[in-house]
Amino acid sequence: MTATIIDGKETAKEKREQLAKEVEELKAQGVVPGLAVILIGDDPASVSYVTGKKKAAETMGMKFKLDRFDSSLTEAELLTVIDQYNQNPEFHGILVQLPLPDHISEKAVIERISPDKDVDGFHPLNVGKMLLGEDTFLPCTPHGIVELLKKTNVDLSGKEVVVVGRSNIVGKPVGQLLLNENATVTYCHSRTKNMSEHTKKADILVVAVGKANFIKADQIKEGAIVIDVGVNRLESGKLCGDVQFDEAKEKASFITPVPGGVGPMTITMLAHNTVKSARRTLS
């Protein structure tokens, strides 16, 4: 079998068109969804991500503001900027681009953003609501993954899901969201013994470790759905995922490519959360 490609670009495009309509509806009621992004330093990957966020937000008719600071910015100064946006009704979402310089506490920054404007879904209050299955801002990449899985029309209930990776940004929350969909979830990580024994049982395999071509075809169950979250740049300059794509696509039933799989959904779900936050101001 050759796997059906799960087209993240196409799914993101459909979702963005829907969001653009919702933005127009909100504007008609006097609310312009606003996203404020804070970028510290000049890490090329971060600059690229922020550029993508700006383009997406403006294409959907949202207000976008970027505050760029030198990496000498102190933690106290950053927290003051966050406080100003927390109080500013023109902005419904606040995002501080990670990673941060070593002298700034990621925890302090995440906890300073108002839970009502935490469109990344990282604030402990929103993480707690996610664990409880309550309505909240879901983390963007995990939420995007669930949306892509739903496009396959496969019933997630009762499926064996294996998540390789346990980061707070992707691994842990995507497992929780799939548990909320009644899947049976196993986590694998750097201390897991005999990882292949677990991955070969997976009906749905989600890989988010940041290691190029880490998972090979012989670790994948025949007919599995494979979601590859990794984005790695090879010495040749070519981008690849955490899964050996050419091999895996001959074994899986569905697979996400890199690039063009999970990535486009992340920014789309960020826009979704910003629109959701703007809509809340009406109620």
Curated annotation (Swiss-Prot):
Domain of life where this protein originates: Bacteria
Positions of disulphide bridges: none
EC number: 1.5.1.5, 3.5.4.9
GO molecular function ontology, one term from the record: methylenetetrahydrofolate dehydrogenase (NADP+) activity
Job of this protein: Catalyzes the oxidation of 5,10-methylenetetrahydrofolate to 5,10-methenyltetrahydrofolate and then the hydrolysis of 5,10-methenyltetrahydrofolate to 10-formyltetrahydrofolate.
Family designation: Belongs to the tetrahydrofolate dehydrogenase/cyclohydrolase family.
UniProt-recorded name of the protein: Bifunctional protein FolD
Naturally occurring in which organism (per UniProt): Bacillus velezensis (strain DSM 23117 / BGSC 10A6 / LMG 26770 / FZB42)
